[in-house]
């Protein structure tokens, strides 16, 4: 199994999710199952079957999160050699050469990616094109609608 790169923030979010699943969701669903069982015949007890189905989802998610946590490689960008290069965890401001529009992205792990928040996966075409480049470099991103050329305006280790 391969390691899963993750920022410090991403690791904390995943750890918090696991705690909530184990300490809130799991006990709640067990209580729901006990309550539904008390209603009698389990064959036609929709409440019971729904609770058991939810229990399956919760237990599956717990296993998935535990697996990710066991394989995660936490990368603290503030402790990296800050040589100005685009690497995992850096926040990069780009200017589209064609229309002079600016965009800022943070390169994060797969599970943390959220384009609306400006967080892109380290495996995305944009991140792949940016890796290793530095302020002032022009980078060509192969996008579905065609090549897009950006200038790297800044690289921050925050």
Curated annotation (Swiss-Prot):
Q: Which InterPro entries match?
A: GreA/GreB_C_sf, TF_GreA/GreB_CS, Tscrpt_elong_fac_GreA, Tscrpt_elong_fac_GreA/B, Tscrpt_elong_fac_GreA/B_C, Tscrpt_elong_fac_GreA/B_fam, Tscrpt_elong_fac_GreA/B_N, Tscrpt_elong_fac_GreA/B_N_sf
SUPFAM superfamilies attached here?
FKBP-like, GreA transcript cleavage protein, N-terminal domain
Q: Which UniProt keywords apply?
A: DNA-binding, Transcription, Transcription regulation
Identify the domain of life: Bacteria
User: GO: which molecular function terms?
Assistant: DNA binding; RNA polymerase binding
Gene Ontology biological process: DNA-templated transcription elongation; regulation of DNA-templated transcription elongation
Intrachain S-S bonds: none
What exactly does this protein do?
Necessary for efficient RNA polymerase transcription elongation past template-encoded arresting sites. The arresting sites in DNA have the property of trapping a certain fraction of elongating RNA polymerases that pass through, resulting in locked ternary complexes. Cleavage of the nascent transcript by cleavage factors such as GreA or GreB allows the resumption of elongation from the new 3'terminus. GreA releases sequences of 2 to 3 nucleotides.
Question: Of which family is this protein a member?
Answer: Belongs to the GreA/GreB family.
Q: What NCBIfam families is this protein classified in?
A: greA, PRK00226.1-2, PRK00226.1-4, PRK00226.1-5
UniProt protein name: Transcription elongation factor GreA
